[in-house]
Regions:
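Active-site region of PLP-dependent enzymes
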Residues: 148-154, 161-280
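PLP-dependent aminotransferase-like
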Residues: 12, 56-145, 152
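PLP-dependent enzyme catalytic core of the Aspartate aminotransferase-like
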Residues: 339-412
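Glycine-centered flexible beta-alpha turn that most often forms the glycine-rich phosphate-binding loop
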Residues: 144, 310-363
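Conserved PLP-binding active-site segment in aminotransferase class I/II-type PLP enzymes
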Residues: 1-57, 61, 83, 108, ...
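Conserved small-domain helix->loop->beta segment predominantly found in fold-type I
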Residues: 212-225, 256-333, 412
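Basic phosphate/pyrophosphate-binding loop/patch that engages nucleotide-derived ligands
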Residues: 131-140, 182-202, 291-292, 296-307
Length: 412
């Protein structure tokens, strides 16, 4: 039996000291700043927590409106609700599947506090245009880059463009087994106010300099601190993030070159000057081309061994293609939570007394989002990333062409 460390024996933790300290989070934060060029970064427990921290930092609260998209994972709007504010949905661009900046402009009201675009599937939203729009109206852009941590716009890393950007480590392109995320900003005031949303008072007291922030340091954050085990893994992922992303881009470009001429399938669009991180490889299916539904085509793909899902339509409720969704899917404005407008009871936050113009969410509001949700299909990780290469991509192409060659068998 080992001698107690108290009396000169070896420490039980030994080299695992980092698992109980904060230095790994600090190293990750420094690495993120170096990687993106942003001045400040704070690791948190998830991408949702990063978004919620950013919204809190921007002063978003009861009665405020935040423009976002319904064509996304539910957490994008969930972070708005967590701050007791109201999501106002803008439609998407039919090519990039990201926020339509002109529709966002049309949705701005005196109650608009922020714009929350989503870099969906890894393609950046039109952040430069949205930043100009925000400047015109004195509002803040909180970018949801949870699926696009290694993307770029005109050579500038995502995380160094919007007023504040949220990252997530729960999936590609940077992954940590225990999850986690971070918010990044070049604005010291936003950085410090964001700490109040979920950091321990001792953390706030050690980082903040603003007397107003320090005054509220003991307000009782929600404990949105990142697990040090996740931080340890994320640091390693960050070291070769660009190399892995570039390999994934090569794989996806190979797919595009091979399937772009197949009738009925539209391969992903990449806006000039934008670097797509390819969290998913998302195509559009034309059901009229063959008289076969998108869901039937996806069933055939999965049967061939290619994992494919209709993300917006049902990924919030199922990830196994053979399982049944809990309820009808689709863009968020069609989901029960938004149609009923009673998340916290008594109509809050949608119908609370602070809301001047309670939103009504209904079918037909977002025609592009609604159409794309019925046509998209996504090829997922890990099929797109190293060690997969062109040989593996060709297997996916072979599966698709096999289905197209036998498409009449799928007609019902």
């Amino acid at each position: 039996m080992s001698k107690l460390a108290l009396f000169g024996g070896p420490k039980a933790l030994g080299d695992a000291e980092q698992l109980k300290s904060s230095w790994r989070q600090k190293s990750m934060e420094e690495g993120l700043c170096e990687y993106t060029g942003a001045k400040y970064a704070k690791c948190v427990s998830s991408g949702t927590a990063a978004l919620a921290s950013g919204l809190f930092a921007a002063g978003v609260g009861p009665g405020d409106e935040v423009i976002t998209v319904a064509y996304t994972w539910v957490a994008s709007a969930g972070a708005i609700l967590r701050n007791n504010a109201v999501p106002i949905f803008a439609d998407i661009d039919p090519q990039t599947l990201c926020m339509d900046a002109e529709d966002a402009r049309r949705k701005i009201t005196p109650q608009t506090k922020a714009i929350l675009p989503v870099d969906f599937y890894g393609h950046p939203a039109p952040i430069p245009e949205l930043m100009e729009l925000a400047e015109e109206h004195g509002i803040v852009v909180i970018e949801d880059a949870c699926q696009a941590a290694t993307a770029e716009i005109n050579g500038v890393k995502v995380g160094n463009i919007a007023h504040l950007t949220a990252f997530s480590w729960s999936g590609k392109p940077i992954y940590a087994p225990e999850g986690g995320g971070a918010y990044l900003t070049n604005d010291r005031e936003l950085f410090e106010r964001g700490l109040l949303a979920g950091q321990h008072p001792t953390v706030i007291q050690g980082l903040a300099t603003d007397p107003e922030v320090l005054k509220h340091a003991s307000m009782g954050g929600t404990g949105d601190r990142m697990n040090p085990v996740g931080a340890t893994a994320a640091i390693q992922q960050l070291l070769d993030a660009d190399a892995r992303t570039n390999a994934r881009i090569r794989n996806c470009e190979y797919l595009t070159a091979k399937i772009s001429d197949i009738p009925g399938i539209t391969s992903p669009y990449v806006r000039p000057g934008y670097k797509h991180a390819y969290h998913y490889y998302t195509c559009l299916w034309d059901p009229d081309e063959y008289g076969v539904s998108r869901d039937r085509f996806c069933q055939a793909l999965n049967a061939e061994g290619v994992y494919a899902i209709a993300y917006v339509m049902d990924a919030n409720y199922r990830f196994a293609p053979e399982s049944e969704p809990i309820q009808a899917g689709g863009p968020l404005h069609l989901r029960t939570m938004f149609r009923e407008r009673n998340l916290y009871g008594k109509g809050c936050p949608f119908l609370c007394p602070h809301v001047k113009n309670p939103p009504v969410y209904k079918a037909g509001d977002l025609p592009v989002s609604e159409e794309m949700a019925g046509r998209e299909f996504c090829l997922s990780q890990p099929d797109l990333s190293p060690p997969c290469d062109e040989k593996d991509m060709q297997l996916i192409v072979d599966a698709i062409t096999k289905i197209i060659d036998n498409i009449d068998e799928l007609k019902e």
